[in-house]
């Protein structure tokens, strides 16, 4: 039984596979992070309902939230080394005997008919021999359990990757093409489509219990879109949202493993605030709603309603 208990820690020591999951997306993405970001963005774009734009020529405007940031996870993984540790020491009694050398000194004094003899014994201040005896038994017992992680995390400064925005824009254009909607320059479009990407990044978390541990990396893409007819200035697609998240998780037992690795893609929580409930003011008609028609592809024209209010009408 004792041999078995000794072999188990030896077999399990340093058993593990480390995946360097970063604390925040951006900069140089690694393979799993790329897969998650691509999956969440593809799922969100694929959910967009573009049926109202069938047969139209659309000018596409995509705006993405900035994703600059940094991550900080100090220290390694959770260890229960400090929770289970004990020791017992028993030292025997010891006694030491020292032997100091002695020597005699004799002095004789004579004066006329009188004489005296003086004899003295002295001991050196350094022992000539020492003898130590121990009595009793000596014993030492200790018990402990050490489970150390297979990785460590340090401060990271991560930069935004402009290619992510280009990648997402290309995905949206691909879906438009596959749906039969032509994407053209603004001067040739009869429809303006606005896509606002509020969330486009990764979230890392770690679960640490006494027996169960997990590393989780999520990628989320949340966007809102709407479409406007250039001639009538009416909404062809009212503001709608699409939100998806993908997840990669490694599960451990006492940080040994992982014994389970999983990947999932699912719909996530919607935007905390969206524009689906915004309606025109009561005195605003279809003819003087704000005009999204753009002459140079950059600056929007000023609608009739805005001009009237500026004149104080």
Swiss-Prot record:
<dbReference type="GO" id="GO:0007155">
    <property type="term" value="P:cell adhesion"/>
</dbReference>
<keyword id="KW-0472">Membrane</keyword>
<feature type="lipid moiety-binding region" description="S-diacylglycerol cysteine">
    <location>
        <position position="15"/>
    </location>
</feature>
<feature type="region of interest" description="Disordered">
    <location>
        <begin position="282"/>
        <end position="313"/>
    </location>
</feature>
<comment type="similarity">
    <text>Belongs to the MafA family.</text>
</comment>
<feature type="lipid moiety-binding region" description="N-palmitoyl cysteine">
    <location>
        <position position="15"/>
    </location>
</feature>
<keyword id="KW-0130">Cell adhesion</keyword>
<keyword id="KW-0843">Virulence</keyword>
<feature type="signal peptide">
    <location>
        <begin position="1"/>
        <end position="14"/>
    </location>
</feature>
<keyword id="KW-0732">Signal</keyword>
<protein>
    <recommendedName>
        <fullName>Adhesin MafA 1</fullName>
    </recommendedName>
</protein>
<feature type="compositionally biased region" description="Polar residues">
    <location>
        <begin position="282"/>
        <end position="298"/>
    </location>
</feature>
<keyword id="KW-0449">Lipoprotein</keyword>
<dbReference type="GO" id="GO:0009279">
    <property type="term" value="C:cell outer membrane"/>
</dbReference>
<keyword id="KW-0564">Palmitate</keyword>
<keyword id="KW-0998">Cell outer membrane</keyword>
């Amino acid at each position: 039984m004792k041999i078995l208990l000794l072999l188990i820690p030896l077999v399990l020591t340093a058993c593990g596979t480390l995946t360097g999951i970063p604390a925040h997306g951006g900069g140089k993405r690694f393979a799993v992070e790329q897969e998650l970001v691509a999956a969440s963005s593809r799922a969100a774009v694929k959910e967009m309902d573009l049926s109202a734009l069938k047969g139209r020529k659309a000018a596409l405007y995509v705006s993405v939230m900035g994703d600059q940031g940094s991550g900080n996870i100090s220290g390694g993984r959770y260890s229960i080394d400090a929770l289970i540790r004990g020791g017992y020491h028993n030292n025997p009694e010891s006694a030491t005997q020292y032997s100091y050398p002695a020597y005699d000194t004799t002095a004789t004094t004579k004066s006329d008919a009188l004489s005296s003899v003086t004899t003295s014994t002295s001991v050196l201040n350094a022992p000539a021999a020492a003898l130590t005896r121990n009595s009793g038994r000596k014993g030492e017992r200790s018990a402990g359990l050490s489970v150390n992680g297979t990785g460590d995390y340090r401060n990271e400064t991560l930069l935004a990757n402009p290619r992510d925005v280009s990648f997402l824009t290309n995905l949206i254009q691909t879906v438009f093409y596959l749906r039969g909607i032509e994407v053209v320059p603004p001067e040739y479009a009869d429809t303006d489509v606005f896509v606002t990407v509020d969330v486009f990044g990764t979230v890392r978390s770690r679960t640490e219990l006494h027996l169960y541990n997990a590393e989780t990396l999520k990628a989320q893409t949340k966007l809102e879109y709407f479409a406007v007819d250039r001639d009538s200035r009416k909404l062809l697609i009212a503001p709608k949202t699409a939100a998806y998240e993908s997840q990669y998780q490694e599960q451990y037992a006492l940080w040994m493993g992982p014994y389970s690795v999983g990947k999932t893609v699912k719909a996530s929580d919607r935007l905390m605030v969206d524009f689906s409930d915004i309606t025109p003011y009561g005195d605003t008609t279809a003819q003087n709603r704000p005009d999204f028609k753009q002459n140079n592809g950059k600056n929007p024209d000023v609608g009739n309603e805005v001009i009237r209010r500026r004149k104080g009408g």
